């Protein structure tokens, strides 16, 4: 029989332990709580769970038409397959038939028409997935084809929108453009991006005895899944519990898109009384779900001899797909970030929500911000080529100031501006000036291989643009042995959120992080959660957990003060111990004393972000609590005969405030940069003329591999610079801002191609800059050079 009695330590021994620093609190590089499980395969995902007895497997039959009227659906052939339990259409949904997250437009099962190739028309549940698939494909669906809209430019020109356009305006941009010394116009196409999470969309639903459901779902938004499942079943939300331990990746793709499998499973489970599971194969996942919004950009800019902007008109046309989904907020954020780090002067920024017959596009890391930033970075490069200046010089002359030229085009003051200092530090550490000169010399003597260099900044606003989402809850229990149980409303998708929130709680109580146990996110423990998105996971949930921990800690301080007849200031927590004036207790002994004194050792916590507001009718406000800053310097080499390129070196300096966990934050910066680089260089989505996505698997859709990383990648976090706002331990969000660092790679490729034209012409290279587009850009430069040579010869001949 084991001995559970702890060894009693002397006061001297306790004092020595008390004096030591906590090794796993805030600011420490604590290992990700599931790191070992991830690499060993022990981490449990939904598909790893033991199957329930009598569990059904669900397969969705998707539309093969981009736009058509449904004339008839015959599911009778489905039942010819042994093992089929049920086939459902929209007529079988007991409650609400539309699962649009904020407004209607997303029927769970197609009703009268189909709007894109991949829309779910019917679903079949059977004893195994293969039987369900064969049966679903046997159903007979008759269509009458309708004319689809597949091109975002066509939708933009014809004002074919899912929602009304929105405008940010400051000053008289038309007047500024008319009087500017220099004026250029241009267009740009920015491609979308597949989330390509390792774990595809999946849900498993278990009916309960009281008519409710337990939903195991890979989702960034458990409360929304809970709400929508309740609505399609026509029951109250308290009948539905959503359980989410971890996702195998999300990137925004499981913010709204996870609801469809969960709701389909719930309908089948309600109709059959049997547990039901749906896991999308990769091809079906890519066809059925939305992507990052592609954008079409038109710009008209006026500027002076230094490249400083005087006026700008920007048209941002987002391809929203067939329904609103989150597009209103996504296009808004593109507009909010169409300045990136630059004072635009007199500005008009129009955001358009274009409707096409493709899958409804959705949230993706950056949430529209990257597309807005790419637009203005294209403008900066175009100005530099027009004037024959270094693009970095043009960028710096347009930076926001600290006391003037410091208000955005939506009237938020840019506070705590770090752009100049960070750029200067990165310029020096990356040896930008020396390398710029060396690259110009190299290119002058290298006719085929050309090098490019770019240094681009990032200023990214942190907060949900939908203000009501800026709230979070948490629940903490302390047990009598001193162990701590933590639940919060955030979801873990590999980004280390659970580790960071556990560090926050460990820091408050000054205990080892091993004492803190985090379990699955459950809607019956922390209700009304916001999605884990907008880089807000640690900001919101960390603050809520801190609030809950501080509440319990204050009770303990008050108890110790009364019990030992000391002031509250005499009670100090440190390194797993509590000093009460001259006496030192272990943390667990104080907990036991408090329990016997009937002190509550449990608390909820809550947090809402202060200061933020946005008046949409006036198009002005403070939509962001603060800005996160960053800068990246990329060097690339391009083969101008093939368009192929290689990233040679990348230097990154990124601002995370007082880092909660430097190791995790550096990992997020590295991963964000690579994902952003992939979006702008190789990740190309291609649809055929019938509206079918052809790049629908890893064989045709290319994401960055190890070999695509820069040969030399150097990442540094800004040191000794706390977030001046009252965030969790004065940290800053790190999920999305590093993604935009990848813009430097695209700009470096354009810089290399521009060297073919002696840096005086802006190459037309839409994003992603695939080798084909890079080659076209090189040919464009060669043709311009050839035309210039002919013009020079003609002029000489005329003399």
For the regions a protein language model found, what residue spans apply to each?
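Glycine-rich loop/linker segments at domain edges
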Residues: 28, 33-41, 166-203, 294-379, ...
């Amino acid at each position: 029989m084991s001995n559970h009695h702890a060894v009693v330590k002397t006061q001297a021994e306790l004092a020595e332990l008390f004096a030591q620093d906590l090794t796993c609190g805030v600011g420490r590089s604590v290992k990700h709580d599931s790191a070992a499980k991830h690499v060993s395969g022990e981490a449990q995902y939904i598909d790893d769970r033991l199957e329930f007895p009598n569990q059904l497997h669900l397969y969705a039959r998707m539309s093969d038409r981009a736009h058509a009227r449904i004339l008839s659906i015959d599911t009778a052939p489905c039942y010819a397959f042994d093992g089929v339990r049920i086939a459902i259409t929209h007529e079988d949904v007991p409650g609400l038939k539309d699962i649009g997250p904020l407004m209607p437009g997303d029927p769970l099962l197609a009703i009268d028409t189909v709007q894109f190739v991949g829309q779910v028309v019917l679903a079949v549940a059977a004893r195994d997935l293969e039987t369900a698939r064969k049966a679903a494909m046997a159903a007979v669906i008759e269509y009458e084809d309708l004319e689809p809209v597949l091109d975002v430019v066509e939708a933009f020109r014809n004002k074919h929108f899912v929602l009304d356009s929105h405008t940010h305006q400051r000053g008289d941009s038309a007047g500024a453009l008319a009087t500017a010394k220099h004026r250029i116009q241009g267009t740009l196409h920015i491609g979308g991006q597949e989330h390509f999470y390792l774990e595809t969309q999946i849900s498993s639903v278990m009916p309960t005895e009281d008519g409710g459901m337990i939903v195991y779902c890979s989702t960034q938004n458990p409360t929304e899944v809970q709400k929508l499942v309740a609505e399609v079943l026509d029951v109250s939300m308290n009948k539905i519990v959503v359980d989410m331990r971890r996702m195998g990746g999300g990137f925004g793709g499981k913010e709204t898109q996870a609801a469809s499998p969960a709701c389909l499973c719930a309908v089948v489970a309600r109709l059959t009384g049997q547990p039901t599971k749906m896991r999308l194969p990769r091809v079906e996942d890519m066809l059925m779900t939305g992507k990052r919004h592609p954008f079409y950009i038109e710009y008209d800019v006026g500027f002076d001899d230094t490249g400083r902007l005087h006026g700008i008109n920007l048209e941002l046309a987002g391809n929203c797909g067939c329904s609103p989904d989150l597009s209103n907020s996504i296009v808004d954020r593109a507009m909010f970030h169409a300045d990136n780090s630059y004072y635009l002067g007199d500005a008009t920024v129009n955001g358009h929500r274009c409707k096409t017959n493709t899958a409804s596009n959705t949230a993706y890391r950056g949430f529209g911000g990257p597309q807005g930033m790419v637009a203005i970075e294209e403008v900066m490069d175009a100005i530099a080529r027009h004037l024959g200046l270094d693009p970095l010089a043009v960028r710096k002359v347009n930076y926001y100031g600290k006391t003037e030229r410091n208000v955005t085009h939506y009237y938020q003051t840019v506070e705590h501006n770090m752009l100049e200092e960070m750029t200067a530090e990165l310029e020096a550490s990356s040896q930008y000036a020396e390398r710029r000169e060396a690259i110009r010399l190299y290119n002058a003597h290298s006719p085929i291989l050309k090098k490019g260099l770019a240094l681009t900044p990032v200023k990214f606003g942190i907060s949900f643009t939908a203000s009501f989402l800026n709230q979070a809850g948490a629940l903490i229990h302390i047990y009598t042995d001193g162990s701590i149980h933590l639940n919060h409303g955030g979801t873990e998708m590999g980004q280390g959120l659970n580790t960071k929130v556990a560090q926050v709680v460990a820091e408050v109580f000054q205990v080892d992080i091993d004492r803190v146990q985090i379990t699955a996110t459950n809607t019956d423990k922390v209700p009304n959660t916001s999605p884990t998105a907008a880089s807000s996971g640690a900001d919101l949930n960390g603050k809520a957990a801190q609030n809950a921990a501080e509440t319990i800690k204050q009770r303990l301080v008050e108890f110790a003060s009364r019990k030992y007849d000391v002031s509250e200031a005499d009670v100090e927590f440190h390194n797993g111990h509590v000093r009460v004036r001259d006496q030192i207790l272990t943390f667990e002994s104080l907990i036991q004393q408090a329990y016997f004194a009937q002190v509550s050792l449990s608390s909820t916590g809550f947090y809402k972000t202060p200061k933020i507001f946005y008046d949409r009718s006036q198009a002005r406000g403070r939509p962001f609590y603060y800005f996160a800053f960053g800068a990246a310097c990329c060097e690339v080499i391009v083969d101008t005969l093939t368009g192929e390129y290689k990233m040679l070196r990348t230097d990154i300096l990124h601002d995370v405030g007082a880092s909660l966990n430097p190791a995790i934050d550096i990992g997020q910066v590295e991963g964000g940069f690579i994902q952003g680089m992939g979006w702008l260089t190789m990740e190309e989505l291609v649809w055929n003329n019938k509206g079918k996505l052809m790049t629908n698997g890893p064989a045709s859709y290319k994401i960055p591999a190890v070999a695509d990383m820069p040969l030399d990648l150097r990442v540094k976090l800004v040191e000794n610079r706390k977030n001046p706002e009252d965030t969790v331990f004065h940290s800053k969000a790190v999920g999305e801002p590093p993604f935009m660092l990848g813009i430097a790679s695209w700009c470096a490729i354009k810089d290399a191609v521009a060297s073919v034209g002696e840096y005086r012409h802006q190459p037309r290279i839409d994003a992603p800059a695939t080798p084909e587009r890079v080659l076209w850009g090189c040919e464009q430069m060669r043709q311009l050079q050839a035309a210039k040579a002919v013009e020079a010869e003609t002029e000489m001949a005329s003399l």
